[in-house]
């Protein structure tokens, strides 16, 4: 290298040497530093699918409560919304911003667990529309489901059977997985187009097991279909199952049951869960789902305190 080239390269050489020096000093600190998680709350924590009550139906009211309680963000339960017009979505987005809240999750419902191709097509279209709503709200991820077989009388009946329901007569789980995987493969381009990640939840149907969730995610093989991990949906031996899904998680939904659960209660060890998530490399949001009978005005702040204790 001649003198002119050496002089020209000198700033880059100096910068590189400084970066190496900085790395040698800062890298050990980065390894040991605990990640401080951002914690949001699902509007479900306030409303609980209470169709007969308007007390917590308003998304704006839930946003205001979340901000007052000290949350960092809010996950919206989509079926709780009474107006999904573009103007209504813009108002929700504006209100969250003025309150200093991230809109960080969108909990949606669909089912692909049906032999009827027209019903699956309808649910693909519905989910595409939900992806568009998330895009309009500025939400980066939506919770999605495999759906259920539909052989339970209702959700209460499903819960009495601990989330297990008979398959449709004449069909197998393998039939169901084919329908679900094919449907999500069709949805991946729609999610990518909008920059919204679908997170498949461990949420009954073929998603009742960690293996079932990963069978779908692995088959679709897309960064636009990952996992929404719910701490309260593995009713037996949850920790190994949570650990199995943690590396693929884009949103962690954290259940609490103050006042006793609406359907059941789990004694979850959040110190252990926090360790699982940290060791998996998860650095995303927590979304509180308070599913207890206690008044949310007292139960939700207690839940936030619990999560801050273990995830800060």
Please describe what each predicted stretch is.
Residues 154-172:
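Charged, glycine/proline-rich intrinsically disordered loops and linkers
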């Amino acid at each position: 290298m001649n003198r002119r080239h050496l002089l020209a390269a000198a700033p880059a050489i100096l910068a590189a040497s400084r970066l190496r020096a900085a790395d040698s000093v800062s890298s050990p600190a980065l390894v040991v530093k605990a990640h401080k998680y951002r914690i949001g709350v699902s509007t479900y924590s306030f409303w609980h699918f209470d169709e007969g009550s308007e007390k917590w139906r308003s998304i704006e009211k839930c946003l205001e409560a979340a901000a007052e309680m000290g949350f960092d963000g809010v996950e919206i339960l989509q079926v709780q919304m009474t107006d999904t017009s573009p103007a209504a979505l813009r108002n929700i987005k504006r209100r969250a911003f003025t309150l200093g809240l991230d809109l960080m999750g969108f909990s949606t419902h669909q089912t692909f667990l049906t032999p009827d191709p027209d019903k699956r097509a309808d649910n693909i279209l519905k989910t595409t529309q939900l992806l568009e709503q998330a895009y309009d709200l500025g939400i980066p991820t939506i919770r999605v489901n495999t759906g259920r077989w539909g052989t339970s009388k209702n959700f209460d009946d499903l819960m009495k059977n601990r989330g297990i329901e008979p398959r449709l007569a004449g069909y197998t789980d393998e039939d169901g997985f084919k329908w679900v995987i094919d449907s999500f493969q069709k949805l991946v381009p729609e999610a990518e187009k909008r920059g919204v990640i679908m997170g498949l939840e461990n949420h009954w149907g073929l998603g009742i097991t960690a293996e079932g969730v990963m069978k779908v995610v692995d088959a679709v093989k897309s960064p636009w279909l990952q996992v929404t991990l719910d701490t309260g949906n593995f009713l037996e031996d949850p920790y190994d199952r949570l650990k199995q899904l943690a590396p693929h998680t884009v949103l962690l939904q954290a259940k609490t049951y103050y006042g006793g659960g609406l359907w059941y209660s789990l004694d979850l060890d959040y110190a252990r869960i926090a360790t699982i998530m940290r060791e998996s490399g998860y650095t995303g949001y927590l979304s509180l789902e308070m599913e207890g009978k206690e008044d949310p005005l007292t139960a939700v702040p207690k839940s936030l305190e619990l999560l801050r204790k273990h995830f800060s």
